[in-house]
Amino acid sequence: MNPLTLIIIMFTLFMGTMITVFSSHWLTMWIGLEMNMLAIIPILINKATPRSTEAATKYFLTQATASMILMMAITLNILDSGQWTLINPQNQLTPVLITLALIIKLGMAPFHFWVPEVTQGVPLKSGLILLTWQKLAPLSILYQISPSINPTMMMSVAILSIMVGGWGGLNQTQLRKILAYSSIAHMGWMAAIITFNPNTMVLNLIIYILMTIPMFMMFMQHSSTTTLSLSQMWNKNPLMVSTILITLMSLGGLPPLTGFIPKWIIIQELTKNGNIILPTAMAMLALLNLYFYMRLIYSSSLTMFPTTNNLKMKWQFESTKRMPLITPLIILSTMLLPLTPALSVLN
C-alpha cells in the first residue's frame, strides 16, 4: 500500500474512533462508527489474498448489519424523545436494539462467529488493530448508555461469551484464533460489570489492551502464527518464548500477574452487589481459558518438536525488526499487580 494512502486511512480510523468516543450526539456517533468501519477494510486487505478479502467481506457484512440495527434504534429514540442526545430512552425496545447492535460490533456471543474467522484471515498487524483499537468506539457508547442497559441481557451475554471464549479455544492450534477467542472471553468480563461499575469496565479494557499488544508484537517479531512455529522458536530465542508464555498466563488471569487484576475487581464488585452465583460461574468458566493457555505453554516449552538441521541453523537468519516499546509493554502486561491497591479509587 502507498505510504500516503496508509497515513490517510490510519488518520481516518483514528478520527472515526475519536468522534465516537467524545460525542454525545447520536448522528456524530454513528458517523464516527461508519468512518471507523470503512477505514479498517483497506487495512484488513493490505495483503490482497483471497483469504484476507474473504475476511474483510465477512467483517463488512457483519458491521453493516450492526450499523443498520443501530440506526433503527436511533430513529426510534428520536421518534420517542425528539432529541439526538444520549438521554435515557423512553421506549424499552430502544436500549435493547442499541445493545444488540454494539454486541454484534464487539463480537460477543452469540454473535461471535465472525471474530475468529476474520482474525485468522488477516495479517498479524491487522489482527492487532481489530482486537484492540476497534473495541474502543462500541465500548464507549456502551459506557455512556450503561444506566439504561438491561442487566439481565448483559449478564446473559457475559456468561455466554466467557463460555464460548473458553470452549472455542480448546482445539485451536492457530495463535490468532486463540487470541480471538481470548478477546471474546474478555469482552464477556467487560459486559458483566458494565451495568454495575462502568469505570471497572474501562480498567478491564485498558489491561486487556496492555496484554494483547505485546503478545501480537512478539508474534510479529518472529512471524509466529501457529503453536508449531512457537515451539520451534524455543531453539532460536528461548527468552522471547518464556516471555510469551508468561504473558499468556497473564491473559488467562493467573495470579500474581496483571491479568488477575480485572477478574479480581469484577468478582469483588459483583459480590458487593449481591451476586454470588454469577461470579462463581464466571470464575469456573475462566478456568477453560487458563486450561488452553497452560496446554499451549506445555506443548511449547515442556515438549520439544523434532528438529531438523535446517531448523538448527535458523539463528543465522535472525529477524532485523526492532520494536523498542515491546519491553515496557511486556513489563506492564505481567507485573502491574503491585499497583492494584492504588485502584481502590474505583470502588
UniProtKB/Swiss-Prot annotation:
It is found in: Mitochondrion inner membrane. The keyword NAD applies. Its main location: mitochondrion. GO terms for cellular component: mitochondrial inner membrane; respiratory chain complex I. Core subunit of the mitochondrial membrane respiratory chain NADH dehydrogenase (Complex I) which catalyzes electron transfer from NADH through the respiratory chain, using ubiquinone as an electron acceptor. Essential for the catalytic activity and assembly of complex I. The keyword Mitochondrion applies. It catalyses: a ubiquinone + NADH + 5 H(+)(in) = a ubiquinol + NAD(+) + 4 H(+)(out). Its EC number is 7.1.1.2. Keywords: Electron transport, Membrane, Mitochondrion, Mitochondrion inner membrane, NAD, Respiratory chain, Translocase, Transmembrane, Transmembrane helix, Transport, Ubiquinone. GO terms for biological process: mitochondrial electron transport, NADH to ubiquinone; mitochondrial respiratory chain complex I assembly; reactive oxygen species metabolic process. Core subunit of respiratory chain NADH dehydrogenase (Complex I) which is composed of 45 different subunits. Interacts with TMEM242. GO terms for molecular function: NADH dehydrogenase (ubiquinone) activity. Belongs to the complex I subunit 2 family. This is NADH-ubiquinone oxidoreductase chain 2.
